């Protein structure tokens, strides 16, 4: 699209295919590094590329470390950059939490982000309230899917921007 001219790769790395992911990590052994990705709507696709590249490198995915932001609820609240409706988005995230809990227990599947909520105009109290509510929603959905809270909750992280005025 004409509007994308000059914007691709301007904010982060442009990953459009598994070949892009292979190029990104060429010469980097994914088993030896922690990879954090600030990606939300397309997180499942980008994460699948990452896992496939790690497997192609011969990595045991159960030992991989890293974090996905993967906070779709924040997208609905603050950034307005979602792909799927809320219910379907939560199902995808819960499926990813299940996959990582079962196969990649060292990987953080969600970094619940208040930062963007604050940047969208909330007060510090609102940022904290929305972010914790989002975190509770992820936990509730995972438990409804049959995950044991003790197996997945330690892998959740939070990212705040509440400044000194909380």
Describe each region flagged by the PLM:
Residues 1-166:
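Catalytic alpha/beta active-site cores
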